[in-house]
Amino acid sequence: MNKISYNIIIYLLYYMRVLIFGHKGWIGQQIIQLLKSQNKHEFILATSRADNLEKVREEIDIVKPTNIMSFIGRTHGKIGDKEYTTIDYLEEKGKIYDNVRDNLYSPVLLGLLCNEYNIHFTYLGTGCIFEYDKEHPYNTQYNGFTEESNPNFFGSGYSVVKGFTDQLMKLINKNILNLRIRMPITDETNSRNFITKITTYNKICSVPNSMSVLTELLPMLIDMADNKITGTYNFTNPGLISHNEILEMYKEYVDKDFTWENFTIEEQNKILSAGRSNNYLDTQKLEKLYPDIKNIKDSVRDIMKNYKL
C-alpha cells in the first residue's frame, strides 16, 4: 500500500490524526489513555524535540497530522540529588534557560508551525498568570479574569514567562486553542496532583482559587480539538474552592485521621523562592460550550468519593 492510499484510509477511519508533544508527562499520559479508550482518533507520539525547528518540521511532513497537541511545560525538576516538586525549581541558578525553552519557545514554535501548515493546535497553558486586585476582589465569584484579561501576576519566573506565552498565543491566534488550567486535580495519588501535593505539605496556606478537575475537563479538551475550536478559554471548573475545603473533603471521604496546620501567606512567602498566583477565572465562555460542567466544589467532592491512594 502506498503512502497516499494509507493516508486516505486514516482520514476515513479516524476523526483526528494527532501528533502529541509532551506525551511523557503526567497530563500527556492521561490524554493518551483517554484517546486509547475512545478508540476514535489516531495519535502519534512526537519523537522530535519541540525546540528543534527543523526536526519538528520534518516530523510534521512525515506524519501529516490534522491536529497537534502540546502538553510541554516546565514546573519542576532535579538538581543534583535534590528533587524540586514546585515552580521554585525555575528560580534556581541557570534555570531561566529551561523556563524560556519549555514554557515559551517550544509551544510558540509549535503554534507558528501549525499556522504555517494550517493544522489545529491545542496548547495547554496556565491561568497562574493573574492575582486578585481591586478590580478582581479576593474570594469573590464575580468580575473574574476573562479570556481577554492580560496577566497581572509577575511574582515568579514561571508566571512571567507563561504570561508572555499566553499573549503570544493570542497574537498567533488563527489555528490555536489556548487552554488555561489551574491547580490540576485527578482521582489518583500523583506528585503532580494538587490533592496529593497539599496532603503532603507540612503547613497549608488556604486561599480560594479557580482549579481544574482534569478527570472532567480532559475529555472536553479532546472534544474541542476534534471540533477545531480555537481561541483562549479559561479551562477551570466554575466557582472557587480553598485548600481547607479540599482537605476537609479529603478527611471526610479518604482519610478520617488526616490533620493539617494552616499558616498565612506572609509566613508562606518566607519559605518559598517565588510567589504564588491566587485568582478567580471567569468560566462563562467554557460553560456556553459545556453547560453541564460541574461547579468546582461538586466536582472535587465526586473525586474524593472515588479517590485512589
Task: List each model region and its residues.
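NAD(P)H-binding glycine-rich loop region in Rossmannoid oxidoreductase-like domains
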Residues: 52-104
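N-terminal Rossmann NAD(P)H-binding glycine-rich loop of SDR-like oxidoreductase domains
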Residues: 18-34
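Amphipathic terminal alpha-helices
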Residues: 294-309
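Catalytic helix-loop patch of NAD(P)-dependent Rossmann-fold dehydrogenases
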Residues: 92-106, 128-179, 186
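NAD(P)-dependent short-chain dehydrogenase/reductase
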Residues: 155, 167-216, 223
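Mid/C-terminal beta-alpha module of Rossmann-like enzyme folds, strongest
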Residues: 220, 224-273, 277-278
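SDR active-site strand-loop-helix element
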Residues: 21, 71-72, 121-127, 179-181
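Conserved cofactor-binding/catalytic machinery of classical short-chain dehydrogenase/reductase
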Residues: 105-109, 120, 164-165, 213
